[in-house]
Design a protein with these regions (language model features):
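A short, solvent-exposed loop/turn motif at the edges and junctions
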Residues: 46-48, 71-84
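Structural motif
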Residues: 23-25, 29-39
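Structured extracytoplasmic
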Residues: 103-104, 112-280, 286-294, 356-453, ...
Length: 839
């Protein structure tokens, strides 16, 4: 009887436990507690039971178990392990984990016999790079879906006390707050999604992205024109770890599978795992010097092809970077029909630290999903001319389109972020902060279609004008997409002269960038410091308006111009100008220097000239900003400008017939762990006989503000040439030296060095034009300048060195003048400063 009861009890347990055991299902998501970013390949398991699962690229997991347990754990390298209780008797549960980052460093691995087993795998990766790297492809393209989100995080107590935060908190109290389990509030300020296609051509290298639809919502986002060109993400986040260095923020980060992998990383080879059907080596990598620009993380290498299948790489706070709490790149790659691997999914995260205790941090998250990959089918070269194209109806709402076109549905967090932005962006205090931010960034205050500014040039005090007041304006695309107006008016309290400028442009095409316009202006300028010589450095130009204002002259100028992009990266500009020169210093020249003292003397002049300029910028990418365009710097090739000018005597009052030729080449390039460099080569020549201001006055710098294009130990208009060649070279070593010096390395300083060499001369005929001329009409002016020439056999040279990144924004440089040390009152040694915002 007892045996029957025992058998019956056992049979009952079999019927109740065993069938139900197959129905225990636990689903969930593992994410970073600080920023909400998913954690791929995290381990999830039942406590006390040898059964578990790993998360996918989205950080999601599904655990099916025959056994029950009272708790579930989640763990991943670089994060604190977390355990949660399981509801007893529940057959289906959802449990999410938020793992807190830890500062732990990978334990040292000692190999007592033979080499590290990871090294043979890495050599296999390098050996098979040519067949696995996407660079072997002549071209590729794919459908792409991307999401981008910008949040405010790390909200300090002082920042919470600000009125803007109190108003925001009241607005979002009705919503469920977006936060991790650590309770830290995250406030979304911008969210976008886009869908389109990405095209790549290897030789010559071209990138093109077309945006079919985009959905943008953000605090302060008034016009999505330029933002819509960036939301695709492939133009800025197309990372390739097969290259020796992965570049972003103008920095080079050593790849863990690059040629120099052994110099930068420690490696630990783990077990083999299955990743989407590929049996892979799991490998951890850790920086040898945490301050270097390197990664920490894990990667999965295919055991057959030695291809990179997936990587999870982070740059942490200890690296020599500014304002960065963390950078994280997760990439999942897919093999194409050609054998090369392309990214199927990419996650990119930047966590910016709070700059002060009274501020907050920022969090940028980007996700890109690619599918329907086509390889080795290049389009005609002209197809790639426009780097970013946005469909005319791209921003038109279309819920039905998004429902079927998204590669995956929006998450609950995405939907909540969108609702929060709608609530926050209409607050008056938020709109005020947005307007202040726009003013700081652009220098202009927007009033719908009109923008006032730039404010940096609105006021100055100098000895000629007294207090100078200036008000400027420009129109934007809200005024008119084709017509562009600019102008300003100024007045000096001492000279009592009104200055003004007006410009009218018409944009014929923004694809081939074809524009025509006219300008007219009357203003007080300085020899060698005019806007056409200084360029776009508005800060330096504003500084030159203050103080003694030596070399001053009034200029009246009229110009008509036409510019057009002939082909990708090649722009032609033609113009006709008439320009006067009326100096406020003792200035005279001989109209006919061959007559010597018998020549007629003149103290002012007028020139009429035509200009043809050809600019070649290979591989440059342009983005449209309304009716303006912004150039993203070309990397591998120099930007070259060729200019020819011809003066017409007797036409529109011109006093001279002349020819001028100039050549300028500028290039910036990165040298991996050695830092980054840039150089500017400039040359000019005129065969004509002209007064000094019409030759080539070399740009000196008498301020304490460093200007890259100026000679730091040269005075204003100290030297003038009718033929010259110069090279200006700058190099930033980043943390190459200071990262290795104890005590100093904690400051994250960066060593910089520079050198400038100028060769030039003046022909005798040009020196005779202004030699020993004494015009009593100009005797009332005390200032007189010799406009000396350089010795053709003796270059002007100066060298500089200094420290960058002092307090994260300040650069201090020392300059030594190496030649012309007995010329006048030379500036042999100078200390200069500049503000430099960089990561």
């Amino acid at each position: 009887m007892k045996l029957k009861i025992s058998l019956l009890l056992a049979f009952f347990l079999y019927l109740t436990v065993i069938p139900l055991s197959g129905q225990y299902v636990i689903k969930g998501r593992v994410s970073d507690a600080k920023n909400g970013d998913p954690i791929p390949f995290a381990s999830v398991g039942l406590v006390g039971v040898s059964q578990g699962a790993t998360t996918n690229f989205q950080g999601e997991f599904t655990l099916n178990s025959k056994y029950s347990a009272d708790s579930l754990f989640a763990s991943f390298i670089g994060y604190k392990k977390r355990v949660k209780k399981i509801k007893n008797g529940s057959l289906f549960q959802e449990i999410d984990f938020q793992l807190a980052p830890t500062d732990q460093v990978m334990a040292e691995v000692k190999v007592y016999s033979g080499e590290n087993p990871a090294f043979s795998v890495l050599r296999g990766v390098v050996r098979n790079r040519e067949k696995n790297d996407r660079s072997k492809l002549t071209a590729y393209e794919y459908d792409s879906y991307s999401k981008m989100e910008l949040d405010v995080d790390n909200i300090s107590e002082k920042f919470r006390e600000k009125k803007v935060m109190k108003d925001i908190s009241q607005s979002i109290d009705k919503f469920e707050k977006i936060a991790g389990e650590d309770g830290k509030l995250v406030i979304p300020t911008y969210i976008s999604e886009s869908i389109g296609k990405f095209y790549y051509l290897e030789n010559p290298q071209r990138k093109k992205e077309t945006i079919t639809k985009t959905n943008i919502k953000g605090v302060g986002v008034k016009d999505g024109s330029i933002i819509s060109q960036l939301v695709g993400g492939n133009l800025v986040a197309n990372y390739n770890f097969y290259q020796n260095y992965v570049g972003f923020f103008g920095k080079d980060f050593a790849s863990p599978i690059g040629d120099n992998w052994k110099d930068h990383y420690n490696y630990f080879l783990g077990d083999t795992v299955n990743v989407d059907g590929h049996i892979c080596y799991k490998m951890d990598f850790d920086p040898k010097n945490p301050m270097d620009l390197v990664f920490r993380g894990q990667m999965w290498i295919d055991t057959t092809s030695f291809a990179l299948v997936q990587i999870d790489a982070s740059v942490e706070k200890g690296a020599n970077l500014n304002f960065i709490e963390k950078i994280k790149i997760s990439q999942e790659l897919e093999q194409t029909s050609s054998g090369a691997w392309l990214p199927a999914r990419t996650r990119f995260l930047i966590d910016l630290e709070e700059i002060t205790k009274a501020s907050a941090g920022m969090l940028l998250k980007m996700y890109i999903s690619n599918k329907d990959i086509v390889v080795n089918k290049p389009h005609p070269l002209g197809f790639y001319d426009v780097a970013s194209e946005v469909a005319e109806d791209a921003m038109k709402p279309d819920p039905a389109f998004w429902k079927y076109a998204r590669h995956e549905p929006l998450t609950t967090s995405d939907l909540l972020a969108s609702a929060l932005i709608d609530s926050v962006q209409n607050l008056p205090i938020v709109r005020t902060y947005v307007e202040i931010a726009e003013l700081v960034v652009s220098g202009h205050r927007r009033f719908n279609g009109l923008e006032a500014g730039p404010y940096i040039t609105s006021f100055a005090i100098n000895k000629v004008e007294g207090a100078r007041f200036r008000l400027g304006f420009r129109t934007n695309a809200n005024f008119n997409k084709n017509w562009i107006l600019r102008g300003n008016v100024g007045f000096g309290t001492k000279d009592l002269v009104t200055k003004y400028a007006l410009e009218v442009n018409y944009l014929f095409s923004n694809k081939k960038w074809t524009m025509a316009g006219i300008r007219h202006s009357y203003d007080l300028e300085r020899v060698g410091l005019t806007p056409d010589l200084i360029g776009d450095n508005k800060l330096f130009y504003a500084f030159t308006r203050w103080g003694a204002f030596s070399g001053a002259f009034f200029r009246r100028e009229s110009e008509a111009f036409f510019t057009s992009e002939l082909s990708k990266g090649i722009t032609l500009t033609t113009s006709l100008n008439t320009r006067s020169f009326d100096p406020l210093f003792r200035f005279q020249f001989r109209l006919n220097p061959e007559l010597g003292t018998a020549s007629e003397v003149q103290d002012h002049y007028q020139e009429t000239f035509a200009t043809v300029e050809l600019r070649i910028a290979k591989n440059v990418t342009f983005l449209m900003n309304g009716n303006e365009r912004i150039a993203l710097a070309t990397k591998r090739f120099p930007m070259i400008t060729l200019k020819y000018q011809h003066g017409f005597k007797g036409f529109l009052g011109g006093d001279f017939t002349y020819d001028r030729f100039t050549l300028k080449a500028y290039q910036t390039f990165r040298l991996g762990s050695l830092g980054r460099s840039d150089y500017t080569f400039t040359a000019g020549y005129t065969p004509s006989n002209l007064p000094a201001p019409l030759l080539f006055p070399h740009l000196g710098n008498e301020t304490f503000f460093f200007v890259r294009s100026a000679y730091s130990t040269m005075s204003y208009f100290e030297f003038v040439s009718d033929r010259f060649a110069s090279i200006q070279y700058n190099h930033n070593f980043d943390g190459l030296l200071f990262n290795r010096i104890p005590l100093i390395k904690k400051f994250k300083w960066r060593l910089i060095a520079s050198g400038n060499i100028l060769m030039g001369s003046q022909r005798v005929e040009n020196r005779e034009i202004m030699k020993d001329v004494n015009n009593p009409l100009r005797s009332k002016f005390l200032d007189r300048y010799t406009f000396d020439s350089l010795d053709p056999n003796k270059p002007f040279a100066e060298v500089g060195y200094g420290i960058d990144n002092i307090f994260k924004i300040l650069r201090i440089q020392a300059f030594h003048r190496l030649s012309y040390l007995d010329h006048g009152n030379p500036r042999r040694f100078r200390i200069m400063a500049s503000v430099n915002f960089s990561f």
